[in-house]
Amino acid sequence: ENNYLGKGISVNSNVTLNEESVKGIISVYNPNYKNSDKSVYTNVQSIETNRLAAFGYKTNKTGFEVGTDFEYLRNLNIGLSTNTFYEKIETDSSASSLQKKQEGDYLDTFIGLNIDYDKRNQKFQTSDGFRSMYSVDLPIISETNTLTNTYNYKYFTELYENNVSSFSIFLSSAVSLKDEDIKLSERIIL
């Protein structure tokens, strides 16, 4: 629903299934909270990832996120959020000894920061400009203290008439601040 109660509030519920995971989410997004030109959102989600056959572990993660986005300067948007998840990791006999050490229950809370610098000529069917996005998740309550960084840059240009070309780069990293193994569910998998 994109116009809940006629107030422009977006309400979404979604279930995603694939070979190794089940994900359910319910979210509410208000693009103009109390006429402040700031968006506010919240979501509740549950994710089960079953990698028992391939890697010997299974995770079940349930939690919520609350955040806001706003235009800080022209074309520069800032987003702040916090999320808290309860997670259970299970392993079987095929898991490595390092994976078996991570078996158990976890409660993690992160603060998120998103910076979005958007210099595209238009958001739909862009033909010129660029968009640079950076996000970081800082651990507040976490046993492994995993810091996650993501940078995404896209450049658009029209080389020939009605022929738009784009170049993009995507970088992501996850690092434990305590110099320990990163939790199985926080690892970056391509």
PLM feature segments, named:
Residues E1, L98-G104, D108-L190:
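C-terminal outer-membrane beta-barrel translocator/porin domains of Gram-negative envelope proteins
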Residues E1-M133:
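Gram-negative/organellar outer-membrane beta-barrel architecture
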